[in-house]
Amino acid sequence: MRLKVYKIFIVLFFLNSYSYSQNKVSGFAFESGTEIKLNEVSVYDAEVGLITKTNSIGYYEFTTEKSVITLVFIADGYQFIEKYLSIEFDTNLDIIFSNPIQVLNEVVVKANNKKLFQLSRLDDVQGTAIFAGKKSEVISMDLSMANLASNNSRQIYSQIAGLNIYQNDDAGLQLNIGGRGLDPNRTANFNTRQNGYDISADALGYPESYYTPPAEALKEIQIVRGAASLQYGTQFGGLVNFVINDPTSKSFEIVSRNTLGSNSLYTNFTSFSGTSKKLSYYSFINYKKGDGFRLNSDFESFNIFFNFRYELNNKTSLSSEITYLKYLAHQAGGLSDKMFNSDPFQSNRSRNWFGLNWFLYNFKIKHQFNLNSNFSFNFFGLKATRNALGFRTNRVDQVDSNKERDLIKGEFQNYGLESRFLHKYSLKGKKNVFLIGVKFYKSDNDSQQGPGSFKSDADFEFRLDDFPNYNNQSKYNYPNLNYALFSENIFYLSKKFSLTPGFRYEYIRTESEGFYKKINLDGAGNVILNKTIDDSEIRERNFFLFGLGLSFKSSKAMDFYANISENYRSVTFADISISNPAYSINPEISDENGYTFDLGIRGNYFKRFSYDIGFFSLLYKDRIGFVQKAFKDGSVKSEKGNVGDAVMYGLESLIDFDLNDIFIKNNNLSLNYFINSSFINSKYTESMEPGVKGKKVEFVPKLNIKSGFKFGYKNLSLNIQYTY
C-alpha cells in the first residue's frame, strides 16, 4: 500500500501542470565604436555568481525566476559593467563595452570579480541538485592567490571554516582535510567527487581519496557539509566536488605553466581546449617531480585528463571524461614527539614507498525537458591499484632492521550510475522544487598483505617463497553492492522562507572472502605454528536517512539557515582485515551512525564584506576509535573498535572584508582581509570501555584560526596568511 501511495505521489509531481514564472534574459556583447561582438564575456548574478558566458558570436541567454536582478558583465581587458534589471517578461539586454584597456590588468579583473564574491555559496537549485537550507561553500579558483602549482591545500582552503588540514608533501599529491573534528586522512570522511561523480577508491569499503585534481585545472571547488548525506552519500563530513574548467569557446587554446621551487620541485601544467560547432573539449597534462622537504620524501607524478562534450541540440548534451594518474612517492615515515622537537625534517625510513595507478571514466547525459524540468544521468567507473611497501612497526623511533618489508597491494574495480530528475512546480500559488534520484554502485576489490623484498628500491612484488613464515599475511576479495533512492523538495512558504525535507534509502551489502595466516615462533625463532585461517563475512543492511532544512532570506545581505540530517558510515576494509603491528582490530567492530545539525547566518553586505557564522553539532553513535588494551601474550596495544557515543559541537565563522571598497575605492587596487575561526568542544557521552565516558574525543582541535591579507595593485599581487 505504501508503494502505491508513493507511486501516486511521484506521478502527481510529474503531471503537475502548474509552473512558476520564468523569463528569459538574452542579448549580445559589443565593443563600443567597432561593433565587434565579444565572446567569453562572463555574466554574473551579483547574489549567486556566474550564470553563463557569451558564445562565439557574442550572444548570451539564461532564464530566471527573479523579478529584479543585478547583473555584472566582465570581459578581459575592459571595465566591468553592472546592470540593475526589473524583469516582468522576456527581456533583451545588449551590453556595450567602452574602449579596451590598453594594458591588460589581471588584478583589475580579479578585483571586479571580488565585487561579487570571494567565497560564494551554492544557489538553492543548481542543475539537478538542491542546496537550499544547507551550509555550502564555493572556492572560485580564478580568484585564489594560492600556490596552485603545488596544490597548496592550506592556502586553497584557507577560507573554509572549521577544516583541519595537514600536508605530507610539497606538491599536493594527496588531499588531507577533515571538518569539525573528523579525521583528515585522505579526506575519507567526505564524499569526494569530480564533476559530480565519485573518485575515491571505494565509496563504501575504502572511501579514501588518493587522486586529487590539480588546482590549475579547476574552475571551482564545491563543499557541502553533513547535510549532503541525503543526496551524495551518507558520510558525516559531507561533499567535496572538484569542478574542472569548461572548454573555451575559441577554436583552439593552449595554456602551459612551468614552476620551479625549493627542494628541486618542478611542475608542468599544460591544457588544451577548443570548440567547433557542437563539439567542445578540454584536456590537461600535469607532471610533478621533487625531492620533498624531508629526507626520503622524493616523488614523481603524471596526470592526464580528457573531457569531450557534444551538444545534440539546445536541450540535450553528452559528455565523456577519462582521468589517469600515476605516481611514486618515497615515504619518510613518522616521528615521535622527541624526534620532531629535535629535528622535524629527519627521517629514519629510507625503504618505504607508495605507488599508485588510477584510471577513472565517466559518461554523462543532461537533458532539459522544458524550463521547469531537468534530467541528468551519470555513469562512472574506476580501475586502480595502490601499493604500500616499507618497514612498519608500532614504534616510529625504532631503527629499521633492514629485513623483509611489509607489502600491501590493493586492486580496485568499481562502477556505478546516478540518475536525477528535478521539477519546478507551483502548488496553491507557491513555487516548489522537487528532486528525485537513484544510485547504483558495484565494486569488486582485492587486497593482499605479505612479505616484500629486503632491499631499498620500490619493488612491489611479494616474496612469499623467500619469507614463507612472515607474520602479516592475508588475502581478501571484497565484492560490494549498494543502491540508493533519494528525494528532496523545496517548499517556498513565502518569497523569503523555505523548508526542504528529504530522505535517502540505502541498501548496502559488503562482503569479505579470504584468509589470513597465524604464525607463532618460539624463543629461538623456530616456527611452532603456521596456520591458514579462512575468514569470510557478509554484512547486509538497509535503512532510511531523513533530513530537514530551512532558509529565511530576510534581505540580500542576510540569510538564516538551519539543517538537521542523519548520517551513516560503514566499516572499511582497513577496519576489519588489514594487519598492523601498531594496533589490533576488535572483531565486533560495527558501523557508525548519527546526526549533523547546522544553524547559521550568512550574506554579503553591499559587497563590502561577506560572512558566514554558524553553530554546528555532530552526534555520533558507536564512534570508531582506539583504546589501550593488554593482551594474553603480555603485549599492550591500541585496539580499534566502537569506543562509544560522542558529541562534537562548536562555532565556526568566516568574515571577508573588501577594504578597498570600504576605504579606498580604487579599481586598480585589490585589498581584502579575512578571518576564519572555529571553536570546537567534544566528549564521549556513553561507552562500554572503562575510563572513556566524559573524556574528550581524540584529535579534535579546540581552536582553529586562519587569517590573512590579500593585496593587488595593477599586475602585482601579494598575500600573507597566519594559521593557529
Where are the regions a protein language model picked out?
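Short, acidic, small-residue-rich periplasmic hinge/interaction motif at the N-terminus
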Residues: 44, 74-76, 90-146, 154
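Short acidic/polar hinge/loop motifs at secondary-structure boundaries
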Residues: 63, 197-225
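Structural signature of Gram-negative outer-membrane beta-barrels, strongest in the C-terminal barrel
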Residues: 313, 431-433, 439-441, 476-619, ...
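Short strand-turn segments of transmembrane beta-barrel domains in outer membranes
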Residues: 220, 225-229, 239-274, 285, ...
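Transmembrane beta-barrel wall of Gram-negative outer-membrane proteins
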Residues: 260-289, 294-330, 353-372, 428, ...
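Membrane-embedded beta-barrel scaffold of Gram-negative outer-membrane proteins
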Residues: 279, 364-368, 374-390, 553, ...
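Gram-negative outer-membrane beta-barrel transporters
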Residues: 421, 495, 612-620, 637-724
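Extracytoplasmic beta-strand/coil segments of soluble accessory domains associated
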Residues: 127-130, 137-139, 145-201, 219
